[in-house]
Every structure is written in C-alpha cells, then in structure tokens.
C-alpha cells in the first residue's frame, strides 16, 4: 500500500511490520504526537466556537465563513478520531472487532478526503471574492452562497463512495502473525489487495489529488497576480488610502495564500516521508514520523485563520 500512501494525503496507517514491534517503546515520539493532537483539537475547537458564536450573534457572514467553519469541524473530528486510533497504535491493543475497525478507518478516510476538498474549495472561493467586476469570476460572487451547501453535500457523498473500498479491505488483526497483512494498528489490519485493484485505487487517488491541488495552485497564482496589480494601482494613487473593505479582503487573501502554500509544502513533505518509509518498512520510528507529519496541517491551520481574525476577542467578550 506504499503507492496509496505516496499518492494520497488520506493514508490508512498501513505499515508492514512485525507483531513483535512495539511503537509504544518510542515514548518521545508518542508524547510529541499526542501533544500535536492536543494542540490541534484545542485550536480547531476554538475556531469552530468562534464561527458558531458569530452566526448566533447575527454577524454578517462572509463567503468563506462556511468553508472555514466546516474545515475546523472536519479537522476537529479527524484529530479526535486519530487520538482514539493512536491509543491502539502507541499504547496497547484495544481488541476491536472487524466492525469497529471498518467504521474507524472508513470515517477517518472520508474526513481526510473532505479536508483536501474543502481546502481547495476555500482557495477557489477567495479567488472569486478578490476578482474584479470585469472578470467572468465576478458573476459567481452572488451565486456562490447558494451552491456552497450543495457542493458540501455532494462532496461528502462522493468521498463516502470513494472510500467504500475500506469497508471491504479492513479487518480485525488475526491472532497469528501473517506476513502478507498490512497493520493499520494493533487491532486493525488491511487485507492484501491484488495488483489490479491496488493500481486502480492508486490511480483514482492520484487523479483526485492532481485535480484539487491544481485548482489550489491556479487560484493561488491568480490571487497573487491580482494582489500585485492592486498594489501597483495603490502606489499610483498618492494620498489615497485603501478602504476598510479592500483592506479586509486583502488580509483574508493573504491568509488563504499562506494556508495554501503551507498545505502544498506539507503535501510534498508527506510524500517525501512516505517514500522514505518504503525503504524502511519495518522501522516503527519512520512509521511514527509519518503519522505525525500527516496531521501538521490539521493542527496548524486554525491558528493561521485566527491570526488574522480581529473580531475573535470582541465576539467572545460579548
């Protein structure tokens, strides 16, 4: 399954390892990982609470508020689920049956896919918001709010279908050590797949990632061009200050650009770590580092959003 890990930010923690290998002996890695999960859960909980309070208090929502709130919810659920699974990876075997294993790994796979898709959608929305009135994208500004909810529902169903193969391939870890099993955790394992099925699934994941990341890159480049053009125009208007609306849009765009850049860098880093794992298949340390790297984006992203939200303290104070 190393090909799937290489092509997808939605790995199944598959790792060909001996049952005698105990990841909990690496206490430093374990403590670092659970610290990362704790920080990420706190940050995403705070960001989600902020958007809920913002909605309850009747503040005028922005186009990006729903995707940002959804992204924080996805990351919160994903990190909570990972914390639960990690106890079976790093600490002790929980003795889960096949149904629990299928449910946990399937739900995690869906959440990983939705994280990628929501991030891409957020980048495209910000490009639409920043586009000038003469642009063809400007016509989508008024249509976007009505289609966001439909897009979220459609993508949720789509990723549930894409990840449905997990329900067939995940099973409870057998009592006897079997070399052809891929161990997801101490209680859950991945059944060996045929070369054809593995190749088809890897290709689908690769196409999905190429498409979504290409959308991110194109929308990011488009926003960079617009920001540079806006800055040149501002330099020619001596003595004229930017309006608060333009300033707010510019800050939001810079936040999205920062987040997109960070996401792409983390995807590249994740691919590098995933490739290195193929060279050290029985190394628990490499496996643990990969798990840590996979959740850096979910941990850091809420703090990137909050760093530019000036209304957080005001809303919480009431």
Curated annotation (Swiss-Prot):
GO cellular component: a single term: plasma membrane
GO-annotated molecular function: pheromone receptor activity
Transmembrane segments: 33-53, 66-86, 102-118, 148-168, 207-227, 255-275, 286-306
Disulfide bonds: 101-188
Null mutant phenotype: Mice lacking all but one V1ra and V1rb gene (12% of the V1r repertoire) show a lack of chemosensory response to a subset of known pheromonal ligands and changes in maternal aggression as well as male reproductive behavior.
Entry keyword Cell membrane: yes
Keywords noted in UniProt: Cell membrane, Disulfide bond, G-protein coupled receptor, Glycoprotein, Membrane, Pheromone response, Receptor, Transducer, Transmembrane, Transmembrane helix
Cytoplasmic-side segments: 54-65, 119-147, 228-254, 307-318
Residues carrying a glycan: 175
Record localization: Cell membrane
Membrane topology: Multi-pass membrane protein
SUPFAM superfamilies referenced in this protein's UniProt entry, alphabetically: Family A G protein-coupled receptor-like
Keyword Nucleotidyltransferase: no
GO biological process terms held by the UniProt record: response to pheromone; sensory perception of chemical stimulus
Extracellular compartment segments: 1-32, 87-101, 169-206, 276-285
Function: Putative pheromone receptor implicated in the regulation of social and reproductive behavior.
Family (UniProt): Belongs to the G-protein coupled receptor 1 family.
Protein name: Vomeronasal type-1 receptor A11
């Amino acid at each position: 399954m190393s090909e799937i890990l290489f092509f997808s930010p939605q790995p199944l923690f598959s790792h060909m390892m001996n049952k005698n290998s105990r990841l909990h002996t690496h206490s430093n890695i374990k403590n670092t990982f659970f610290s990362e999960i704790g920080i990420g859960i706190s940050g995403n909980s705070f960001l989600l609470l902020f958007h809920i309070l913002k909605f309850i208090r009747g503040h005028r929502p922005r186009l990006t508020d729903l995707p940002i709130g959804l992204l924080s919810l996805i990351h919160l659920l994903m990190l909570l689920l990972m914390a639960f699974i990690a106890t079976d990876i790093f600490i002790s075997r929980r003795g889960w049956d096949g149904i629990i294993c299928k449910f946990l790994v399937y739900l995690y796979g869906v959440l990983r896919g939705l994280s990628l898709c929501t991030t891409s959608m957020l980048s495209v929305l910000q490009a639409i918001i920043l586009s000038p009135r003469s642009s063809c994208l400007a016509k989508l500004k008024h249509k976007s709010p009505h289609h966001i909810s439909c897009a979220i529902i459609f993508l949720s169903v789509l990723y549930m279908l894409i990840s449905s193969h997990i329900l067939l391939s995940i099973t409870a870890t057998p009592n006897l050590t079997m070399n052809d099993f891929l161990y997801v955790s101490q209680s859950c394992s991945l059944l060996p797949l045929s070369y054809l099925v593995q190749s088809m699934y890897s290709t689908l994941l690769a196409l999905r990632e190429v498409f979504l990341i290409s959308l991110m890159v194109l929308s990011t480049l488009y926003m960079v061009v617009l920001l540079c053009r806006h800055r040149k125009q501002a330099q020619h208007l001596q003595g004229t200050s930017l309006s608060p609306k333009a300033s707010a849009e510019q800050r939001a765009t810079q936040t999205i650009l920062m987040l997109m850049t960070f996401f792409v860098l983390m995807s590249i880093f994740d691919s590098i770590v995933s490739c290195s794992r193929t060279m050290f298949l029985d190394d628990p340390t490499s496996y643990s580092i990969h798990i840590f790297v996979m959740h850096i984006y979910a941990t850091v992203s809420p703090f990137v959003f909050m760093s530019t939200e000036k209304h957080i303290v005001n809303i919480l104070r009431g």
